[in-house]
Amino acid sequence: MGSFEEAFKFPIVAWNKVCWPVEVGGLGIRRIGLFNQALLGKWLWRFGCETNRLWCQVIASKYGETSGGWCTRVGRGSQGCGMWKNIRKGAKSFFGHVLYVVGEGLHIRLWYDLWSGHIPLKDLYPDLFSHALGKDVWISELITITSDGGSRSWNIQFHQAPDDWEVERVDAFYEHIYSKMRRGVGVDSLFWKLTLNGVFDVRSFYNSLSAPPTISFPWKCIWSSKVPKRVSFFLWTAAQDSILTIDNLVKRNLHLVNSCCLCRCDGETVDHLLLYCKFANAL
């Protein structure tokens, strides 16, 4: 990213900033490791959505299933060799962006899984969870579906009947879970939180992994101007305060006299050289 002399090159901008999206001040260069992880996330999504496909059944048979069948167990020893081992490594970050949509409820746990919102019910209603019978139960064990599939009823049991002061809390709990159940009968499915339509895409997963800052940057003024790209690049480095002025060279431990090479009136910073120097003002 620039050079001071042919024998030695200074890194002008930190690589993590270069990899930020253009909109927040980077160059939009993808980090290969994170992009590869995002690509592998597509296979985790397919494994959860294509359970009847032969390849899913083979993988599940080899490694075993966990989390209601949405993912496999971690392979160990020689069992963990191969491509799936690397795919499985990204499961924790992947499932952090997944909600579960209840169909029959065979693969979704009432209290632990994210199906009724972004907080599991055990954390949203800790008082009721502490009194619940069978804390690790599947939703299918607690609902009764009418023959036409039009409505469902819950049968959640607690250690004791709620006290008078708890009745309102229990009513709010039931109102909450009823509101999150879709009508009709279907299979349990995944919903990707990072897209509006709930379908996984690589770009949204990559952006979550790279976690760029939410800052304002005049990227349109820099990259949309009708000037040569080298001029745009110079403006970008100036906006990053990364031009190799004497002030920045001193920060890189070079022993120089920090004085403007044009006016000799102040230190040669980016702001002084381009904005406040009397020679710059004359331009």
Regions of interest found by a model, annotated:
Residues 1-283:
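A helix-boundary/hinge signal
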